[in-house]
From Swiss-Prot:
Disordered: annotated segments: 75-96
Database matches in InterPro entries: NAD(P)-bd_dom_sf, Sc_DH/Rdtase_CS, SDR, SDR_fam
Binding site for NAD(+): 6-29
Active-site positions on this chain: 145
GO molecular function: oxidoreductase activity
Record's protein name: Protein MoaE
Native species: Klebsiella aerogenes
Amino acid sequence: MARVVVITGGGTGIGAACARLMHPAGERVFITGRRDAVRAVANETGATALVAMPPTARCGASGCCRRSSTRPAGLMSSSAAPAGWATAPPPRPATANEREALDGNLTSAFASVRACLPSLIARRGNVLFVASIASLAAGPQACGYVTAKHALIGLMRSVARDYGPQGVRANAICPGWVTTPMADEEMHPLMQAEGLSLTEAYQRVCRDVPLRRPASPEEIAQACQFLCSPQAAIISGATLVADGGASIVDVPTLAFA
């Protein structure tokens, strides 16, 4: 019997790549998101699409899990690129931008897990949180995003700790730069300031990454597929870093490179 997989934020980037990879592999895939691109990916892959309006994709996940025929064995709560976004730090706490960052990157994941948890327990399923290297370090001008991403790792560990005895696994993947539409937008200020092409901008931000390049959405999707698969049955509470080696760089020594 095919497993049922719910992917939040499945319309673009990593989420869309996961849908394209998992549906042909025999999984029964449901994708949710806030944009009409979700329907396009569903038409392309044969997945079932549910479009939820802002502020989060949690309604879509709830809709999937309420269907009697949709008892997911896997929930991919994608908050790094598909169902999440970064904003500049607000001038004072609790502004709309800060709340938007927390809603899009943390609250949506909480709600998605809560909606699907009964089915995950019944099926001894697993949850994969698509986090970010912002879960492990702080980038500039991204206070709300960094805060939410750090908290996402805590949520993953709590799910793994509390529901492991009932057979539920929870893990997180932390990508670095990935060539997604959201990351493309983040390149625009650098492109405008320095007259760079999109490719050159990615080369610039990855110049100190050991592999010297960003990941493709497909590369991250392959790692996601493994963590959700039976081959990873003993892996729970883990954080897989998929950043080309960026997080191992000793920044103070870069001047000597």
